C-alpha cells in the first residue's frame, strides 16, 4: 500500500519533536516499510524544517483558506536516518511559524484555547488534502491522520466539494492524547470553521463538541469521520470507551466515550499495543553505564542553567542530586540499585495518582520513594502544569533517590 501519514511531529526530522507522537510517527513508518508498504510522512515545516541540509522544493501550489488564496510549498527532506520505502515531506507557509521559527505549538490565552494552532493546522490540512488530490504523493491507498492536528483532512474529505474525491482513499485516525481535543467555534472568530472555509456545509451532530454545541471538536471529528480509529493498546480501548472520573484518578473517554464506544461497536476502533524497539539485547554494565548517564545528565542540566537569567530551583535540585549520586558511585563499587526513568508532559493524566494522599498522610510518590530507598532511584524529565511541577519539586527535596 501507499500510505500518507499526516502529523504535527516526527522525530525522523531534527527539530520536529515535542512529545511522544513524534516517536510513534518516526518508528511506525520504517516498520510499515519493512512490510513492503510505501510510506510518506507529511508535516508542517514551521519555516525551519525545509531549510535542513538536502531538502528540495518539489512543488508550489495554491489553496483557499480564510476565504482567500494562499500559496504553499512542498519540500522533500532526507531526515536524520533515511530508510528505504519511507519519504519525508514538509509543507511551508508563513502561518506555520506563528509561534516563532521552528516552534511547533503556540501557547494561546485561556479565553482562546487552540486558536493559533487550530488555524495553523487547518491550513496545513487543506494543503495536505490539495497535495493528495493533485497526486503529488502518487496513488494513495491510506491517509493516516495523527491526533486532532490532522483531523481537518477528514472534515474536508467528508464535506468540502473540492476534496470529496479523497473519499476513495481509506482513512485511519490515531489517538495520541485524548485530553487535547482542539475545540474551536463554528463561527464568530477568525479561528473558526466557517472563517477557515466559508460556506462549508457540515453535519454538526457528528463533529460538534459534546459540551459546547456551538464549537467544533477536532478530536471528535477525526474519530467520527475516519474509516478506522487506532488507540495505543487494547487495554486503552477498554478505558476510553468508559466515562472519565478524574476525582478517582481515572481518565477514560474524556467526554468522547459515547463516540468511541459506537466506533468500537461498528468495528472501527482498534487497539494496537505500542512497542519499544531495541537494537539488541545487551547485558547491562551497571556501574559504567550509570556513570555515563549521570555525567551526560549533569552536563545537560548545567547547559540548561547557563541559559537562565534566574536559576530555576528544579535544575538546582537536579544538579545537586546527580552530583550526589556520582559521589556515591565513586565511594562504592558494584552499585546494584535499579534505575527508573520517566519522560513526559506533567498533566493530571500522568501524575494525578502519584499525588493521592495515602493512609499515612504522605503522597503515593513519597511512599514509593521511601520503599525504593537504598534499592532504586527515579529520574523524571518533564514540564507542564505548574502545580504538578511544584509538587514534584517538593518531593524531590525530600528524597535523595529522586
Which residues make up each language-model segment?
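Catalytic cores of nucleotide-sugar-dependent glycosyltransferases that transfer UDP/GDP/TDP-activated
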Residues: 1-402
Amino acid at each position: 500500500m501507499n500510505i500518507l501519514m499526516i502529523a504535527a511531529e516526527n522525530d525522523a526530522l531534527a527539530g520536529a519533536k515535542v512529545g511522544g507522537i513524534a516517536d510513534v510517527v518516526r518508528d511506525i513508518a520504517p516498520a510499515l516499510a519493512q512490510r513492503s508498504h510505501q510510506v510518506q510522512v507529511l508535516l508542517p515545516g514551521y519555516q525551519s524544517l525545509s531549510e535542513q541540509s538536502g531538502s528540495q522544493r518539489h512543488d508550489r501550489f495554491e489553496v483557499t483558506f480564510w476565504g482567500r488564496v494562499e500559496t504553499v510549498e512542498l519540500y522533500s527532506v532526507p531526515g536524520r536516518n533515511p530508510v528505504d520505502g519511507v519519504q519525508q515531506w514538509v509543507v511551508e507557509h508563513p502561518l506555520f511559524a506563528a509561534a516563532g521559527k521552528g516552534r511547533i505549538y503556540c501557547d494561546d490565552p485561556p479565553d482562546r484555547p487552540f486558536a493559533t494552532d487550530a488555524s495553523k493546522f487547518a491550513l496545513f490540512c487543506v494543503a495536505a488534502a490539495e497535495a493528495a488530490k493533485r497526486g503529488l504523493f502518487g496513488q494513495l491507498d491510506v491517509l493516516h491522520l495523527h491526533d486532532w492536528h490532522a483531523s481537518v483532512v477528514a472534515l474536508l474529505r467528508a464535506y468540502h466539494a473540492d476534496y470529496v474525491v479523497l473519499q476513495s482513499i481509506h482513512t485511519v485516525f490515531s489517538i495520541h492524547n485524548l485530553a487535547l481535543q482542539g475545540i474551536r467555534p463554528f463561527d464568530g472568530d477568525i479561528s473558526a470553521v466557517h472563517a477557515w472555509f466559508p460556506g462549508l456545509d457540515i453535519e454538526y451532530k457528528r463533529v460538534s463538541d459534546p459540551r459546547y454545541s456551538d464549537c467544533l471538536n477536532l478530536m471528535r471529528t477525526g474519530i467520527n469521520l475516519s474509516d478506522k480509529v487506532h488507540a495505543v493498546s487494547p487495554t486503552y480501548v477498554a478505558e476510553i470507551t468508559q466515562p472519565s472520573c478524574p476525582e478517582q484518578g481515572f481518565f477514560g473517554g474524556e467526554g468522547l466515550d459515547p463516540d468511541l464506544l459506537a466506533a468500537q461497536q461498528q468495528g472501527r476502533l482498534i487497539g494496537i499495543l505500542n512497542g519499544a524497539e531495541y537494537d539488541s539485547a545487551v547485558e547491562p554494565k551497571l556501574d559504567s553505564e550509570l556513570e555515563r548517564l549521570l555525567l551526560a545528565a549533569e552536563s545537560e542540566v548545567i547547559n540548561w542553567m547557563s541559559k537562565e537569567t534566574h536559576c530555576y530551583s528544579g535544575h538546582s535540585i537536579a544538579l545537586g542530586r546527580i552530583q550526589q549520586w556520582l559521589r556515591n558511585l565513586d565511594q562504592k563499587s558494584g552499585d546494584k540499585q535499579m534505575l527508573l526513568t520517566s519522560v513526559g508532559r506533567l498533566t493530571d493524566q500522568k501524575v494525578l495518582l502519584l499525588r493521592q494522599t495515602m493512609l499515612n498522610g504522605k503522597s503515593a510518590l513519597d511512599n514509593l520513594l521511601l520503599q525504593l530507598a537504598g534499592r532504586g532511584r527515579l529520574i523524571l524529565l518533564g514540564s507542564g502544569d505548574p502545580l504538578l511541577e511544584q509538587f514534584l519539586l517538593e518531593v524531590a527535596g525530600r528524597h535523595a533517590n529522586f
